[in-house]
Design a protein with these regions (language model features):
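Flexible gly/pro-rich beta->alpha loop and the following alpha-helix that scaffold active-site loops
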Residues: 30-94, 106
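Glycine-rich beta-alpha loop elements in corrinoid/cobalamin-binding modules
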Residues: 115-117
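Catalytic nucleophile loop
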Residues: 99
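Amide-donor transfer/coupling interface in amidating biosynthetic enzymes
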Residues: 2-31, 38-39, 45, 84-87, ...
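Structured adenosyl-cofactor binding patch, chiefly the S-adenosyl-L-methionine
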Residues: 102-103
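Post-Walker A helix-loop "phosphate-sensing" segment adjacent to the P-loop in P-loop NTPases
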Residues: 107-113
Length: 227
């Protein structure tokens, strides 16, 4: 069984977009099941512990994004999830907010990219108004090769929706991607199947299929695809 951690803040589901978020989580769950041929269980972030993952016989952990900023979470609610991912007991893939969870779990500060300059136009004023951000399907410059990045070319198009970023690379990880706005886009652990992306590969489309390729590569190398 795969575990897909719903990293959405518990207050978000009471908001007007709560049902859309849940629908998106279910769609991603089905995509992971279709890619691997295995079952996938959605578990809320504040319920994850190593004991639960062992009880579920989890084969891997996928961590969703979130509409909330990282500083809105109670650190106590993330202890179990942080303990699980840093134990290196399971393959882990963090998407956007999940990437930021990984960064924090491994000791790296996460903070806003920064405010727009006075002469900069805010092209997406309904998303993090006044802040530097990335939003939409945009190219990611790959800075070095890795088996997980096979088939992506030099600048795959991925879905972006973030105004926060990891401010450094965690120990035992390397960064494999960058953009002009945010230099840390892909963290891959040097010895364990742990990856995080600041973007959303799980929102791949027929027009922009690179996210599917990346997730498939991870699932294949982690031994998650049933033959």
């Amino acid at each position: 069984m795969l575990v897909f951690v719903d990293n959405e803040h518990i207050d978000a589901y009471a908001k007007s977009w709560g049902e859309k978020i849940m629908a998106a989580r279910v769609r991603i769950k089905y995509r992971l099941e279709d890619l691997t041929g295995d079952h996938c269980l959605i578990v809320r972030y504040n319920q994850v512990t190593p004991a639960l993952l062992n009880q579920l016989e989890a084969k891997a952990i996928f961590i969703s994004g979130s509409s909330a900023n990282p500083d809105e979470y109670d650190p106590a609610d993330l202890i179990g999830l942080h303990t699980a991912v840093t134990s290196k007991q399971w393959p882990v893939f963090g998407f956007c907010g999940g990437f930021e969870v990984l960064a924090e779990a491994f000791g790296i500060a996460v903070a806003p990219i920064g405010p727009l300059a006075a002469d900069e136009t805010d092209h997406n004023p309904n998303f993090a108004p006044g802040m530097k951000k990335e939003f939409g399907y945009l190219p990611i410059k790959l800075t070095k090769s890795h088996p997980l990045l096979a088939g992506l070319g030099d600048a795959p198009i991925m879905r972006q929706a973030h105004s926060w970023e990891a401010k450094a690379v965690p120990k035992d990880f390397e960064n494999y991607g960058e953009t002009a706005v945010s230099h840390h886009q892909i963290f891959i652990h040097n010895t364990h199947p742990i990856i995080g992306t600041q973007f959303h590969p799980e929102y791949y489309t027929d027009e922009h299929p690179s996210g599917r390729t990346l997730i498939h590569n991870f699932c294949q190398q982690a031994g998650l695809i049933k033959q």
